[in-house]
Amino acid sequence: MIQAYFSNIRNIILNEIHNSKRDISIAVAWFTQRDLFNAIIGAIDRGVNVSLILINDIINRNEYGLDFSLYLQKGGKLCFVDSKKVLMHNKFCLFDGHLLITGSYNWTYAAEQRNAENIITTDELNVCNDYTNYFTSLWNGLTEVTEYSRIRLSDIVEDNFLQE
């Protein structure tokens, strides 16, 4: 079954995180939403395997953002995509290999508070399998992060940032 949603998206995702039993695979460009972060930490604490792919940029690594070192310490798996090579603009999540959420929704406060966003959910096996294979392909092309550090905003050299 396929369903489309245009509101209450954060709560839909939270519900699926809480219902997951085995694994969660997440590929989102940006992740700043603390409620979703806390929910995936809770999933790890329940024994759920969580794998996360994010863009390696200031939004995901700034000193005021989410502390992914806690996520790693709890046993979460993390890969960053080099934003200088490609803009990984995906926004999807697989729950236990049989439910997919995808759409325009980044896991950010802006997506929740300001943006007009949408998602679809599906349990169609062929679609979930396609996304599982795509996630595995993305993951296998990256290096898993074992240590996480934040970027201080004051350390960014504006000229270099604008040239990239």
Which residues does each predicted region cover?
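PLD/PLD-like phosphodiesterase catalytic module centered on the HKD motif
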Residues: 1-26, 33-164
